[in-house]
Amino acid sequence: MKRPNSLHRLVAALAFASLSVAAQAADITVGYQTGIDPTKVPQADGLYEKAIGEKIDWRRFNSGPEVIAALASGDLQLGNIGSSPLAAATSRKLPIVAFIVSAQINAAEALVVRNGSGIGKPEDLAGKTIATPFVSTSHYSLLGALKHWQSDPSKVKIVNLNPAEIAAAWRRGDIDGAFVWSPALGEIKKSGKVLTDAAEVGQWGAPTFEVWVARKDFAEKHPEIVARFARVSLDSFADYNAHKAEWTADSEPVKKIARLTGADPRDVPELLAGSTFPESQAQLSADLLGGGTAKAIAGTAEFLKEQKRVPAVLGDYSPYVSADFVRQAEQVQVGQR
């Protein structure tokens, strides 16, 4: 069944306003990952370019630390990263700003152990090989789970593999388990069992989330571009939240997500349900961009320091989070309708 797409309506509404943005030409390179989320749909449809009025060079990365490195070098202006690499980068004072929370991770990341590995409970992890991308949200969740279980991380062989490498290592039988996201997660779950996931670890005191960040110099020079990027993202969240029952394996949105990420379309609906995608009101609340996100970054940084992953924790992470662009996006939406 065809229904009007709110994102396409937004693009039409912004068409005239985008002309003024195009007059201020900007080189825009955006780094994305393979996480399953609604923003992949407007990315596939070219709606970000249409709303902004600029060409975007989209670059795919395997992990947050890779995105951080590209942001630091100036190769990217915008990037999608998790809370753990965000905390690591901002603790080192990388000049970036988180302008939208793109996902609150629940079951979308999980620790899966191989069938036949002999792992039936947390105590069985000792001596086993568990893979995860280092300094990622999954790595943070893995360490948080081990802490909760009072398991010594040094007794577990934790290896640094990106999601594609995890899937390959799993097929070869080189690893006993992995804490990771999709599409690797969807693949390894077919011959393994979930020992815990990010939702449960979050309840134990180590929540994880994902954000879109911008280089501060780019955001200061082109705030309207960042705001329009936020607007398209927020509308994709609203579209999914309002019609999630229609996002089935054979639906067009799910097929687009699968094509961009390499995930099996049959896995996508469940993986989408494994995260929360906050809309504007939630973004601006005290729980997220209104203060909670900065506090969560600080908490993550404290944990990373305990694990000797960062040298020091800043006294205040609020300079690295801004609600301004979501507010501007709200004004653009209202003003152009």
Predicted segment positions?
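Sec/Tat signal peptide C-region and signal peptidase I cleavage site
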Residues: 19-25
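Short, glycine-/small- and polar/acidic-enriched structural segments
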Residues: 26-152, 157-160, 176-182, 198
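A bilobed periplasmic-binding-protein/Venus flytrap-type ligand-binding module shared by bacterial periplasmic
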Residues: 44, 109-119, 208-224
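Bacterial N-terminal signal peptides that target proteins for export
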Residues: 2-11
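Extracytoplasmic/secreted envelope proteins and their assembly/folding machinery
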Residues: 45, 68, 72, 83, ...
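Short, solvent-exposed loop/beta-turn-alpha elements that line the ligand-binding surface or hinge
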Residues: 46-53, 200-204, 280-291
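Conserved C-terminal helix/tail region of periplasmic/extracytoplasmic solute-binding proteins
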Residues: 294-337
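Secondary-structure end/capping motifs
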Residues: 220-309
